[in-house]
Design a protein with these regions (language model features):
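PRY/SPRY (B30.2) beta-sandwich protein-interaction domains
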Residues: 1-201
Length: 201
């Protein structure tokens, strides 16, 4: 039973626009000064309710979220950050704003993230919803188990997704898809991301 990790650097539109992967393919880091250094993991969906955590080691430009596996963002040579396109969703760690189809600084949603904070991500690909939380509390009174107060309700349910993050210089995240032992209990009905759970109908 293998858990998801970041086994490859999928972002290929710009040879300079990459990040490094370490710590058993769970820590993603952007060390160069170029804007954005996203990396992506194995796909989830279509369908299912999924949960993971992203411990922010350094907040440098970090924007964790999801992207459709077919998104132009994966091959974008302009270095647009996650949440720029209509088929990717993210939050901005520096201010907690949420982004989707947004070329600006996002929409007010949560609170700023500091180093060593744990960002929670719950994705409902059955009903097209996504939530983010911080250190055990979902933003904006979100309740994934009840399906209420989602950050977005327009997540496409017919395509698979990668978990991903934009990063600027120094940005770093330690991801946990269940193999490290979650810092917080997943919402009822939401699963860790491993081969057994992905294989379930």
């Amino acid at each position: 039973n293998n858990h998801m990790n970041f086994a490859s650097l999928v972002r290929g539109g710009d040879a300079d626009n990459i990040a490094t992967i370490s710590n058993g393919n769970l820590t993603t880091t952007r060390s160069a000064s170029k804007h954005a250094g996203p990396v992506t993991g194995t796909a989830i969906g279509p369908g299912g309710k999924w949960y993971c955590e992203a411990k922010v080691i350094n907040t440098g430009g970090v924007q964790p979220g999801i992207t459709a596996t077919t998104s132009d963002w994966l091959w974008d040579t302009i270095e647009n950050t996650l949440g720029f396109y209509d088929d990717n969703w993210s939050i901005i760690a520096s201010n907690g704003n949420k982004r989707n189809d947004d070329s600006g600084s996002g929409v007010s949603y949560g609170s700023a993230v500091s180093a060593d904070d744990v960002v929670q991500i719950a994705v409902d690909l059955d009903n097209g919803k996504i939530w983010w939380g911080l250190n055990g509390t979902f933003f904006a009174s979100g309740a994934p188990a009840d399906g209420t107060n989602a950050a977005f309700t327009n997540v496409l349910t017919t395509v698979p997704y990668f978990f991903a993050s934009s990063m600027e210089s120094g940005g770093s995240i330690e991801w946990d898809f269940g193999q490290l032992g979650f810092a917080h209990t997943p919402p009822t009905g939401f699963k860790a991301i491993n081969t057994n759970n992905i294989a379930e109908p």
